[in-house]
C-alpha cells in the first residue's frame, strides 16, 4: 500500500442559534469524535468563535454559532465528515479547506531545523 502524506485541514461550521448552549458543546464534541475516529485525523486546535451575525439570512437565521477546527489527516475519509454535516439539521453551514499555507510553513520550519542540525553536527566534528 502506498504511503499517503498527512495534510492540514480547516473545517468551519455554523450551528443554528436556536440550539441550546449545552447541545452546541455536545455537537462540537461529536464533530471532534468523527474527525478522530471516522476520518482518522488528529486535531491540532479548536476555536469556538461564538455567536456572529450573518451578512444575509441562512435558513431563516440572521446569526449562528461559529466553530473552526484545525486537524491533520490523509484526506481519504473526509467524506465521512461532510456526510455528518449534511445530515445534521443543527449545522446550517459548513466548509472544509485544505490549508496549503500552513503545510508550506511547516515544511519550511522542518527544513530549517534539519539544516540547523546538519550545520551543528558539522561544527562538532571540526573541533
From Swiss-Prot:
Biased composition range(s): Basic and acidic residues: 106-117
GO terms for MF: small ribosomal subunit rRNA binding; structural constituent of ribosome
Keyword tags: Ribonucleoprotein, Ribosomal protein, RNA-binding, rRNA-binding
InterPro entries attached to this UniProt entry: Ribosomal_bS6, Ribosomal_bS6_sf, Ribosomal_S6_plastid/chlpt, Transl_elong_EF1B/ribsomal_bS6
GO biological process, alphabetically ordered: translation
Residue segments, region Disordered: 106-127
GO cellular component: cytoplasm; ribonucleoprotein complex; ribosome
UniProt xrefs under Pfam families: Ribosomal_S6
Compositional bias of kind Acidic residues: 118-127
Coiled coil: none
Family, per entry: Belongs to the bacterial ribosomal protein bS6 family.
Stated role: Binds together with bS18 to 16S ribosomal RNA.
Protein name: Small ribosomal subunit protein bS6
